[in-house]
Regions:
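Substrate-binding pocket helix/loop in short-chain dehydrogenase/reductase
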Residues: 85-87, 93-98
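Conserved glycine-rich Rossmann-like NAD(P)H-binding loop of the short-chain dehydrogenase/reductase
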Residues: 15-32
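Canonical Rossmann dinucleotide-binding motif of NAD(H)/NADP(H)-dependent dehydrogenases/reductases
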Residues: 1-19
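Residue(s) in the substrate-gating loop at a strand-loop-helix junction
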Residues: 129
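Active-site helix of classical SDR
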Residues: 109, 146
């Protein structure tokens, strides 16, 4: 509902794609959907969802099925970071982190991939990070490693399904000033 995800949404809308947006904040989603729909003349639907909830991927998929949405592009772009150094966070914090940035991406991809295989067409984008290639960080001990995993996962998907008309791309932006850095405490550590 902000940052890189917002810009990807606008770029797809400019190209005429109808959108289904998910985020935790219902009010932000409704406002964003209205803004994009009016500006670009596309249909925008929303589903409020927290990807740290293990039922979220199935709920999102079921919402799309119920509404008979034909998903041709899946963008996995949830932002999440723990607000402290590794030794200060709880195991529950780390599990939430892995669920949002790892397990939910795998689950959503698995669910929508089967529909794409049936159509023999689809595009999967995983928003990763240049942190996958950077030296390990004191600030976020798991962030770079999970982004490395996401890059390899995307490569594996592309190799495994490209011949069936499905492509997968990992996008690795560098440091980008967004709400993510403020909310996660990363900006404070960098200042």
């Amino acid at each position: 509902s902000s940052g890189i995800g917002l810009e990807i949404s606008k770029a797809l809308a400019r190209r005429g794609y109808n959108l289904i947006l998910t985020a935790r904040s219902e009010s932000k989603l409704i406002s964003l959907a209205s803004e994009i729909s009016e500006k670009y003349g596309v249909k925008v639907d929303t589903i409020t969802s927290d990807l740290s909830d293990q039922t979220a991927p199935n709920n999102i998929f079921n919402f799309c099925e119920l509404n008979k949405y034909d998903i041709s592009v899946l963008v996995n772009n949830a932002g999440f970071a723990n607000p402290d150094k590794f030794h200060r966070t709880s195991m529950e914090d780390e599990e939430r982190f892995i669920r949002v940035l790892g397990i939910s991406v795998i689950a959503l991809t698995k669910l929508f991939l089967n529909k794409m295989l049936y159509k023999r067409h689809g595009k999967i984008m995983i928003v990763s990070s240049v942190a996958a290639y950077a030296p390990p960080s004191v600030i976020q001990s798991l962030y770079g490693p999970i982004k490395t995993f996401m890059n390899r996962f995307s490569e594996s998907l592309n190799t495994s399904y490209n011949y069936k008309g499905i492509t997968s791309t990992a996008v690795c932006p560098g440091y980008t000033v967004t709400n993510f850095h403020t909310a996660s405490g990363v900006q404070d550590e960098m200042d």
